[in-house]
Regions:
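Secretory/endomembrane lumenal or extracellular ectodomains immediately following the signal peptide
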Residues: 1-61, 178-181
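Conserved alpha-helical segments that form or flank metal/cofactor-binding pockets of metalloenzymes
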Residues: 61-95
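Acidic, carboxylate-rich catalytic segments that either coordinate divalent cations
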Residues: 138, 162-181
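Alpha-helical scaffold segments that form or flank carboxylate-/histidine-based iron centers
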Residues: 27-31, 59-74, 145-150
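Acidic/His metal-coordination segments adjacent to aromatic residues that form catalytic metal sites
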Residues: 101-110
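Short alpha-helical scaffolding segments that buttress acidic/His motifs in well-ordered protein cores
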Residues: 36, 46, 50, 64-70, ...
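Acidic/histidine-rich alpha-helical segments that form the ligand environment
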Residues: 109-150
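Short amphipathic alpha-helical segments and their helix-coil junctions
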Residues: 41-56, 99-102, 130-139
Length: 181
């Protein structure tokens, strides 16, 4: 949870270079994107490496993966962005969204959802997957879906490192992590 009053690297403001302006016609110019917009090459490399398209995972599976990774990495910024823009579209209840913030919460999920949470936990804890767990994953996911899950988890760990290291302030209207009791 960030307590900074401003991001460590200030976001760029309009007018943006033409190549970036063209991208902002298609995606919301969030604070993270605007920080990266300070350099056209970094912006393009980052945005082009995304996984928000229709891939081998359902919207729900993709967003559960992202929310779980962001929660485990304590990236309030990115977790809030995905709750705000995607959680309802993916069909998550408020209780399910809250569950993503609980460490080792796979017991709160069932089926493929539980496997996704366990996979995120395993990779967060050890950056490897035990052979018996891989066999379990292979029984439930196609190879390309597993490959996409691994890439998605890696991508969002990168995003979390970036957002946390930059101490990005939450986006307007994005939910925050609950305060500890």
């Amino acid at each position: 949870m960030t307590t900074a009053k401003e991001s460590r690297i200030a976001p760029a403001e309009a007018p943006w270079p033409e190549s970036i302006q063209a991208r902002f016609q298609k995606l919301t110019p969030l604070r993270l994107f605007r920080v990266l917009a300070r350099d056209e090459r970094l912006f393009a490399r980052f945005v082009d490496g995304g996984f928000l398209d229709r891939g081998h995972l359902s919207l729900r599976e993709r967003e559960l993966t992202i929310l779980t990774v962001c929660a485990r990495c304590r990236s309030e910024y990115e977790w809030g962005v995905h709750v705000h823009f995607f959680a309802k579209k993916a069909g998550f209840s408020e209780a399910e969204i809250a569950s993503t913030l609980k460490p080792s919460a796979s017991a709160a999920w069932s089926g493929r959802d539980a496997l996704i949470v366990r996979l995120c936990d395993a990779l967060q804890d050890r950056c490897e997957i035990a052979e018996d767990f891989w066999t379990e994953l292979r029984a439930s996911f196609a190879e390309m879906a597993l490959l996409e899950l691994l890439l998605l988890i890696g991508k969002y760990r990168q995003v979390c490192i970036l957002t946390n290291a930059l101490a990005l302030l939450p986006e307007k209207d994005a939910p925050r992590f609950p305060l500890p009791a």
